Swiss-Prot record:
It comes from Trichormus variabilis (strain ATCC 29413 / PCC 7937). Residues 39-308 form the CoA carboxyltransferase N-terminal domain. SUPFAM superfamilies: ClpP/crotonase. Its EC number is 2.1.3.15. Component of the acetyl coenzyme A carboxylase (ACC) complex. Biotin carboxylase (BC) catalyzes the carboxylation of biotin on its carrier protein (BCCP) and then the CO(2) group is transferred by the transcarboxylase to acetyl-CoA to form malonyl-CoA. The lineage of its organism: Bacteria, Bacillati, Cyanobacteriota, Cyanophyceae, Nostocales. This is Acetyl-coenzyme A carboxylase carboxyl transferase subunit beta.
């Protein structure tokens, strides 16, 4: 098995070098520098080396084994939203440190480090846009920012997005990836579960569509709240989805869990998600679902109305 993976990886590498030789001679030092600079990506599942440009063209899905690599919020928005239609919301909301929380370092220092490293103020981006010309309110969680944990800013931004969608009568799509509620904010982070759920209930009362997309991983308080409240719940292949961690459950039950436990495929089998959609098909799938749930026009077509009027006149 390992030999086959190495062979596939070497074949891909040789093909690329062969193409480069056709385009023009390069020296070994330049080739090594290009690999080190991120021109190549090694799949964590099958070990195949893929030209990063080709991997991005395939939405960061391994062309050999189909493994879905983790992507950031900007890449998600690029993949899903029609060009030049994205309008971000609440970009300047920033977390505070009301508990003066400190573990190995102060929470305020962690927030500052994340901002400096990633250019993000928190773990979600929200906004309005279009998916194949259909308007949508979209929230995209970003696992790079403190494990995608849900704090007061994440909760507030998602709640405001849902309220705006309800007012505009837009469907809501949330791309979920999270380790759960943010412990550094204590009860304030747990309150976001109820706040978002209440906003979604008002959205549902208005007979509007909500679709969560569960990606790897979706766990903790996010799973226990808005991730599982969708009208239609989608998941990416092989995504880890659950509440408590696998090791915690095994230690509590003192039992060995099945290999597919807490996977998207296992949840689909037991009815917790409605479908598993490969990332390359996600935009079109969302577009079709949104189109199917558009409200039926209440005004009769003009031709039908004219026919009814003529019939009424003739009868008189």
């Amino acid at each position: 098995m390992a030999n086959n993976e190495e062979s596939r990886g070497l074949k891909s590498l040789f093909d690329w070098f062969a193409n480069r030789r056709k385009a023009g001679a390069t020296n070994p030092e330049r080739q090594e520098r290009e690999i080190a600079d991120g021109l190549w990506h090694k799949c964590s599942k099958c070990g195949v080396l893929t030209y990063t440009k080709d991997l991005r063209a395939n939405q960061m899905v391994c062309v050999e084994c189909g493994h879905h690599n983790r992507v950031d919020s900007d890449e998600r928005i690029r993949q899903l939203i029609d060009q030049n239609t994205w309008r971000p919301m609440d970009e300047n909301l920033r977390a505070t440190d009301p508990l003066q929380f400190r573990d190995r370092k102060a929470y305020s220092d962690r927030l500052r480090e994340m901002e400096d490293k990633l250019g993000l103020l928190d773990a979600v981006k929200t906004g309005l846009g279009q998916i194949n010309s259909s308007p949508v309110a979209l929230a995209v969680m970003d696992f790079r920012f403190m494990g995608g944990s849900m704090g007061s800013v994440v909760g507030e931004k998602i709640t405001r997005l849902i309220e705006q969608a309800t007012q505009r009568r837009y469907p809501v799509v949330i791309i979920c990836t999270s380790g759960g509620a943010r412990m550094q904010e204590g009860m304030l982070s747990l309150m976001q579960m109820a706040k978002i759920s209440a906003a979604l209930e008002r959205h549902r009362d208005a007979r509007l569509l909500y679709i969560p997309v569960l990606t790897n991983p979706t766990t903790g308080g996010v799973t226990a709240s808005f991730a599982m409240l969708g009208d239609i719940i989608l998941a990416e292949p092989k995504a880890t989805i659950g509440f408590a961690g696998r090791r915690v459950i095994e230690q509590t039950l003192r039992e060995k869990l099945p290999d597919d436990f807490q996977t998207a495929e296992d949840l689909l089998k037991h009815g917790f998600v409605d479908d598993i959609v490969p990332r390359t098909q996600l935009k079109n799938t969302l577009s079709q679902l949104i189109a199917l749930h558009q409200p039926v026009p209440t005004t009769p077509p003009m031709v039908l109305w004219e026919t009814m009027s003529l019939s009424s006149t003739a009868a008189e």
